[in-house]
From Swiss-Prot:
Effect caused by changing S381T: In a breast cancer sample; somatic mutation
Biased composition (Polar residues): 195-207
Description of post-translational modifications: Acetylation at Lys-150 is predominantly observed in the nuclear fraction, and may regulate nucleocytoplasmic transport.
Subunit field text: Interacts with DAZ and DAZL.
Record field: compositional bias (Low complexity): 280-294, 364-379
Protein name: DAZ-associated protein 1
Length: 407
């Protein structure tokens, strides 16, 4: 609808509509007083729910007086309040409370005939309020404030009387008993009646405000990605930059990569490792001890590495150990008695999926080993010479040839 001054002629403002009232029912009701050329119900833009009021325009402006003379009006079980829409410039000063409520200081001739009613019971409607306050004078308007989201009264409203004497009689009692509940009643003062201190924020500034850059610089820093890490005290460190001397962060979710695969050099170890056999140096069957590098540590200098095998690099983060293939030799003659040293090199262990240097330890001197369970005796003890190993627990490799008559 156009809100120009000429378009206001013949138009009615209808307040107090029920939430279920539609434009069709509103038009049908007022059609009994004359031809309705336009009808609209104001709705909330967000929820598309009725706001409780609307406008009706008649083709004949005289129909407005007929509607006002036929009060009260009831639609969909609710009392409605139709009022003429007078152009703003044609309203008399007394009937323009909006300007007195919004602008300028309060004066004697800007007093409003409106009272504020607070603490209204939830089961009290506009009809009950009108019936109660009409004993103080002629009630011209009843406005209850509703919650736009919950679509229910907020517990307060405004009553407008025809004269100021009725307002004085109503506010003589500060508290009124309405439907068994104590209700506060006081004169409704214009919005700017009280002096406002300089610099004090207005009513429109008390709403929710969005503070720009609320993070104060925190939001300007991008979060670390998977290829980045966190330095000391939670500082962000770009990808590839050293973090506290630990080198560049590994790829992935921050977890170090698994040790390089030792194909055909590492034996499958059950949970907890093999128990060390008696008679062998301590730590022989212990699980490998890895350092912060990416490969196993080199063997101690006092232990024997397999012949022909280069020592592993001692630099942390070096490439995986690479052993040369074992020399091809014929199998030992099982009919010959064992000698002091095996007649095949230690590189033969590669065929059994083992390499003791990968565990960080090797064999001790065969002549200094104590006897073990089921193992051959050392030279000088009356038994055949040892081959550097026995047949105790946890051993799944063969150091020397097997003889069927030696146990």
């Amino acid at each position: 609808m156009n809100n120009s001054g000429a378009d206001e002629i013949g138009k009615l403002f209808v307040g107090g509509l029920d939430w279920s009232t539609t434009q069709e029912t509103l038009r049908s009701y007022f059609s009994q007083y004359g031809e309705v050329v336009d009808c609209v119900i104001m709705k909330d833009k967000t929820t598309n729910q009725s706001r409780g009021f609307g406008f009706v325009k008649f083709k004949d402006p005289n129909c407005v007086g007929t509607v006002l003379a036929s009060r009260p009006h009831t639609l969909d079980g609710r009392n409605i309040d139709p009022k003429p829409c007078t152009p703003r410039g044609m309203q008399p000063e007394r009937t323009r409370p909006k300007e007195g409520w919004q602008k300028g200081p309060r004066s004697d001739n800007s007093k409003s005939n409106k009272i504020f009613v607070g603490g209204i019971p939830h089961n009290c409607g506009e009809t009950e309020l009108r019936e109660y306050f009409k004993k103080f004078g002629v009630v011209t308007e009843v406005v209850m404030i509703y919650d736009a989201e919950k679509q229910r009264p907020r517990g307060f409203g405004f009553i407008t009387f025809e004269d100021e004497q009725s307002v004085d009689q109503a506010v003589n009692m500060h508290f009124h008993d309405i439907m068994g509940k104590k209700v506060e009643v006081k004169r409704a003062e214009p919005r700017d009646s009280k002096s406002q201190a300089p610099g004090q924020p207005g009513a429109s500034q008390w709403g929710s405000r969005v503070v720009p850059n609320a993070a104060n610089g925190w939001a300007g820093q991008p979060p670390p990605t998977w290829q980045q890490g966190y330095g000391p005290q939670g500082m962000w460190v770009p990808a590839g930059q050293a973090i506290g001397g630990y080198g560049p962060p590994p790829a992935g979710r921050g977890a170090p990569p698994p040790p390089p695969p030792f194909t055909s050099y590492i034996v499958s170890t059950p949970p907890g490792g093999f128990p060390p056999p008696q008679g062998f140096p301590q730590g022989y069957g212990a699980p490998p001890q890895f350092s912060f590098g990416y490969g196993p540590p080199p063997p101690p200098p006092d232990q024997f590495a397999p012949p022909g095998v280069p020592p592993p690099p001692a630099t942390p983060g070096a490439a995986p150990l690479a052993f040369p293939p074992p020399p091809s030799q014929a199998a030992p003659d099982m009919s010959k008695p064992p000698t002091a040293q095996p007649d095949f090199p230690y590189g033969q262990y590669a065929g059994y999926g083992q390499d003791l240097s990968g565990f960080g330890q090797g064999f001790s001197d065969p002549s200094q080993q104590p006897p073990s369970y089921g193992g051959p005796s050392v030279p000088g003890s009356g038994g055949p010479p040892a081959g550097g190993s026995g047949f105790g627990r946890g051993q799944n490799h063969n150091v020397q040839g097997f003889h069927p008559y030696r146990r």
